[in-house]
């Protein structure tokens, strides 16, 4: 009996491993706006859903790093659902306080941008499997706002 149960567990584990899963990628990270206390950037995330039913997104966790330091992090609870058999674009707003940008003055230099690494964890609720996290990481450069951006 025990042997039969082990075979059943292995069969289910193999089928779950080979199931198609949603895939995601960061398509863009851009300046969005300036407020009195922070600069807001917007990360665009493309997520494809291979299933014929919508899948709820539980949360999005993010961490923005520059010069080896975490400059922003947070969680976006319940950002919606993935469209059935389609690609969904998600907007992830990231707020960076002005005080932290000032501490990155060495990295900013003459080109008025910062090198960044954006780490995202997209937590989705897959039927049968349960919560599943899609880890994403993107490196690049973000332009800092100019005076004209602040008064536009």
Swiss-Prot record:
Q: List, alphabetically, the InterPro entries matched.
A: Lea14-like (IPR045043), LEA_2 (IPR004864), WHy-dom (IPR013990)
Domain of life per record: Eukaryota
Read off the SMART domains from this record.
WHy (SM00769)
List this protein's GO terms for biological process. Answer: response to desiccation
- Similarity comment: family membership: Belongs to the LEA type 2 family.
Q: Spell out the protein name for this chain.
A: Desiccation protectant protein Lea14 homolog
Query: Source species, please?
Result: Glycine max (Soybean)
């Amino acid at each position: 009996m025990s042997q039969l149960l082990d075979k059943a567990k292995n069969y289910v584990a193999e089928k779950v491993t080979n199931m198609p899963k949603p895939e995601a990628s960061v398509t863009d990270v851009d300046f969005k706006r300036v407020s009195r206390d922070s600069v807001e950037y917007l990360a665009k995330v493309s997520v494809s859903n291979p299933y014929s039913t919508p899948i709820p997104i539980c949360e999005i966790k993010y961490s923005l790093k520059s010069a080896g330091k975490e400059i922003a992090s947070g969680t976006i609870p319940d950002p919606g659902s993935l469209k059935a058999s389609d690609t969904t674009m998600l907007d992830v707003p990231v707020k960076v306080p002005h005080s932290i940008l000032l501490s990155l003055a060495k990295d900013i230099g003459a080109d008025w941008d910062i090198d960044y690494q954006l780490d995202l964890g997209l937590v989705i609720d897959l039927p049968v499997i349960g919560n599943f996290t899609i880890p994403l990481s993107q490196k690049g450069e973000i332009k800092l706002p100019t005076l004209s951006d602040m008064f536009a």
